[in-house]
Each structure stands twice: as C-alpha cells, then as structure tokens.
C-alpha cells in the first residue's frame, strides 16, 4: 500500500500525495506519458529512491522504517526487470539466471543449475541454457530477463517498459507470458508502461500520472477510466496512444 507518497530530487517535487493499493495476484499498471514520473515512482517502490513524504508498506511493514536486515528481507520478495533488461553479455542464459540464486541462497551448484533450467523453461526458453544474450532476439532477451527476475520466486514482479523496442507481435507474446505467469503462479505484477495495447490486455487496476500537475489524475482499470474519467489527458492517452498523439499534434 502506498499512502501520501511524494517523491522528487532535492527540493524539486515530481509527484505529490500518491496513494494506491495493489491487491495480491493483480496486474497493476502505472500509466502516463513521457516525463510523468513513472520510473521515479517505480524506483521509490523498490526502495531505490527515498520518499520526501508518505510511506510504502508491504504486508503491513513500512519499507523506509524497516531495520536493514528486515528491509533486505522485504526487497528479496521482489523480482525486477528494468527497461534496459540488461543481461550479462559474457554469461550464458543459465549463468545469468543463476546470479540471484548464487547471491541469495545456499543451494548447491547442481541445484542452482536445475532452478535456472526450470525458470528458462517457464518463460519458453527450454534448451537455450547455453546460449549467450547476443544470440537471442530482442523478445527472447526480455524473456530471459523475466526468468532471472523470477529466479527467487518473488511475490511481486516489477516490470519497467518490458515491451519497449519490440514489434507488435513480439510485444503481444510477451504480454501473454506475463498473463500466464500471473495466472499459473499467482504472482503480483506491477507494470510501468505507456504501451496502449499492453495496458488493455494486462491491467486489472492502475493509476495514471500527470507530470505537469505532479500527481495521480486517474485510478482504476483502463476500461473504468475510459467510462468514468473526466480528465481529457487520460481519455486522450487511452484512445489515441498518449505520447504518439502528442507527437502527432506537435508535428501538425
């Protein structure tokens, strides 16, 4: 649960008084155009950007007030795929997936290898354990990144623009994988995206950020927002593609 959260840099506030709740097993989408504060909010949720005000609670525990050992335990419940999705280029896929297992578990080398194979199979990369990232397509690299993010069986999977740079068909298949992971494992997903197709395919609930007004201007599923929002910026985004529509208007 996020309550009264304000985040920024120095004295500059980027978002004010952000509040929302993510239900277990939900796909919760953080929406908004470029520069709206989506990535900054994500960093705050991951404990990487201290809030200026308010609090972030996981399972009733306030992240910023938890003692270091307990805080590490909370963060270990998270799996993260950042927008870069960077895999270690000199490591095989299995070795990439093994990194968090080697850092945070006491499994033997054989057990780690078995888990890595399982996670790669989970995302549709069975038999690809010994490939290097450079041998993969963009979509396969994103899948491998998700496999690594799922290595420790996280309660919450955070995905930052996972479809960025992918063609529409590959993006659709990645969305289908995200849905399958949620449906089969019950994993809660927090998704940052401005991809309209992904938003409508995936979102159970979400918030819409307005960087100019430094706050949330919409909350609910995309269909609820379309039906009930009176914010023109929200309606434009959900009907015309947000950033794409703004770019077209500027060119006109």
Task: Describe each region flagged by the PLM.
Residues 151-155:
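A short, proline-enriched helix->beta-strand linker immediately N-terminal to the Walker B motif
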Residues 46:
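Helix-to-loop junction immediately C-terminal to a conserved catalytic motif
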Residues 54-62:
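Conserved ABC transporter NBD signature motif
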Residues 157-160:
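Catalytic Walker B motif of ABC-type/P-loop ATPase nucleotide-binding domains
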Residues 132-136, 140:
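Conserved ABC ATPase signature
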Residues 62, 109-127:
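Conserved ABC ATPase "signature" region
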Residues 63-79, 109, 225-229:
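ABC ATPase NBD coupling module
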């Amino acid at each position: 649960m996020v309550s009264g959260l304000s985040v920024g840099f120095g004295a500059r506030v980027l978002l004010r008084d952000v509040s929302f709740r993510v239900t277990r097993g939900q796909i919760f989408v953080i929406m908004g155009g470029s520069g709206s504060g989506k990535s900054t909010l994500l960093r705050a949720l991951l404990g990487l950007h201290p809030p200026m005000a308010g609090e972030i609670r996981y399972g009733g525990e306030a992240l910023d007030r938890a003692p270091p050992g307990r805080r590490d335990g909370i963060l270990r419940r998270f799996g993260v795929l950042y927008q870069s999705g960077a895999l270690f280029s000199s490591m095989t896929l299995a070795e990439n997936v093994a990194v968090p297992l080697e850092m945070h578990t006491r499994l033997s080398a054989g057990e780690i290898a078995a888990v890595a194979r399982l996670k790669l199979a989970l995302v549709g990369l069975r038999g690809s354990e010994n490939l290097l990232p450079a041998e993969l397509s963009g979509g396969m690299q994103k899948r491998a990144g998700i496999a690594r993010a799922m290595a420790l069986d996280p309660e919450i999977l955070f995905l930052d623009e996972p479809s960025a740079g992918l063609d529409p068909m590959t993006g659709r298949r990645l969305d289908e994988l995200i849905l399958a992971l949620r449906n089969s494992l019950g994993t809660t997903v927090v998704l940052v995206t401005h991809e309209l197709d992904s938003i409508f395919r995936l979102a159970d609930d979400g918030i819409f950020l307005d960087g100019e007004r430094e706050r949330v201007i919409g909350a609910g599923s995309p269909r609820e927002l379309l039906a009930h929002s009176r914010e023109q910026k929200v309606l434009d985004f959900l009907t015309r593609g947000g950033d794409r529509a703004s770019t077209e208007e500027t060119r006109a």
